[in-house]
Regions:
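Glycine/proline-rich, positively charged
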Residues: 117-226, 230
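Glycine-rich, proline-tolerant flexible connector loops at the mouths of alpha/beta enzymes
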Residues: 81-100
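C-terminal segment of N-terminal export signals and the immediately downstream linker at the start
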Residues: 26-58
Length: 389
């Protein structure tokens, strides 16, 4: 354990400069001389929909984390719900979770994901996840990356997930979505099948999504909020503003949210997040979020899906704009490389670069041309750094 060498006030000042969802380059140097907080936050538990699981309102998104010490610190703080996926870090993320919680499995809830394939491939994926996680069951198995209401009501989804439950490989099941969230939640609410929905949800989203979250929660679906920090931009890029705890508290005000899974990468970040459970949203927090929203305007795609179908070449703009968030917000270009393996990013960015005039208009005022130009720069740079297998 790190020694307690500094006071609480200075500690808070230091950690407020760290980014939620992206690793600070000098954080390892800081950690060597930084004392951990002796205080354990007052935990808030909420029920994860009809699963009945009592989860900490602030839980942990593990996607960008590569340090098992962060997981163990979260566990020490009392956080009990962890979100990972088969594809994160090409499986290494699940392996880290499994190793960190070996011997503690009964004290944590693990949510992981499976991608749509034929049953044989999906079954193989689940089996790999079980091995990596060092467990014989998954608490919540999520069908990853839905983007249309039809996918939410897919009979193949129902059949496969039902088999996983019957075989004891998954206790509960659900889906995740980054786009068209409101329409997907409304569709899911019509069915009694889904136990959990993992949804991109933060202070930038519309009243329509908030209402859909309420409808889904009323139907018994446990709502897990991701992307709660709206990209997690670093303090230095926002003129010293560090609104990430305020963004988290804003989401926790919505009692229809069972838990939030902010993406953290450092011990300092998870401590800052956990502290959000014991402090109320203030007027000062509101002012911070207003400044943050002003900073984000024209920078971040909310994945609302409003521009789908507008491109004459059929290029999905959200896939390209997510690249900007990976680089500029998360500061994790490894995610760009992973995205290139799963999508046609290179082909699509080439189409964009050859297009004489972009006809796509963002309803939220995003400068589409400028963002696509940035995405092109980051994609090309990542493609050049990939070493052929």
């Amino acid at each position: 354990m790190l020694s307690n060498t500094i006071g609480r006030r200075r500690f808070i000042k230091i950690i407020s400069s760290t980014l939620l969802g992206a690793a600070a380059p000098n954080i390892l140097k800081v950690r060597s001389s930084l004392g951990r907080s002796e205080k354990t936050p007052t935990l808030e538990y909420r029920t994860l929909g009809k699963t009945g699981l009592k989860v900490t309102a602030v839980s942990m998104g593990v996607m960008n984390c590569s340090d098992p010490a962060v997981l163990l610190r979260a566990f020490d703080l009392g956080i009990n719900f962890y979100d990972t996926a088969d594809c994160y870090m090409k499986g290494r993320n699940e392996e880290m979770v499994g190793k960190a919680f070996e011997g503690k499995r009964q004290k944590v809830f693990i949510q992981t994901k499976v991608h749509a394939h034929d049953e044989k491939k999906m079954r193989a994926s689940v089996e790999r996840s079980l091995r990596r996680l060092r467990t014989d069951y998954i608490d919540v198995l999520v069908w990853h990356g839905h983007s249309s209401p039809e996918e939410v009501s897919d009979p193949n989804l129902f059949e496969f997930m039902s088999k996983m439950k019957k075989e004891g490989k998954a206790r509960f099941t659900g889906f995740s979505t980054h786009s068209h969230m409101a329409s997907l939640l409304r569709e899911a609410a019509k069915s009694s099948f889904h136990d959990v929905a993992l949804v991109s949800y933060n202070f930038t989203h519309s009243k329509d999504l908030k209402e859909a979250v309420a409808l889904a929660a009323k139907s018994g679906i446990g709502i897990v909020a991701m992307k709660t920090q709206a990209g997690g931009y670093k303090k230095e890029k926002m003129g010293g503003l560090s609104p990430h705890q305020a963004a988290l508290k804003y989401i926790l005000m919505d009692q229809n949210v069972s838990c939030a899974v902010p993406g953290v990468t450092t011990i300092e970040q998870i401590e800052e997040c956990a502290a959000a459970m014991e402090v109320s949203f203030s007027k000062g927090n509101l002012n911070e979020l207003k400044q943050y929203q002003s900073f984000l305007r024209g920078r971040i795609c909310t994945m609302c899906g409003g521009c789908i179908g507008e491109c004459a070449y059929g290029v999905p703009r959200s896939d390209l704009l997510r690249v900007v968030m990976y680089h500029d917000g998360y500061q994790n270009d490894g995610l760009i490389g992973e995205a290139m393996e799963k999508t046609e990013l290179l082909q699509n960015i080439k189409l964009c670069s050859e297009c004489p005039s972009c006809s796509v208009v963002c309803r939220r005022g995003l400068d589409m041309k400028a963002q696509i130009k940035l995405a092109q720069e980051f994609i090309v740079r990542s493609s050049e750094s990939i070493v052929p297998g």
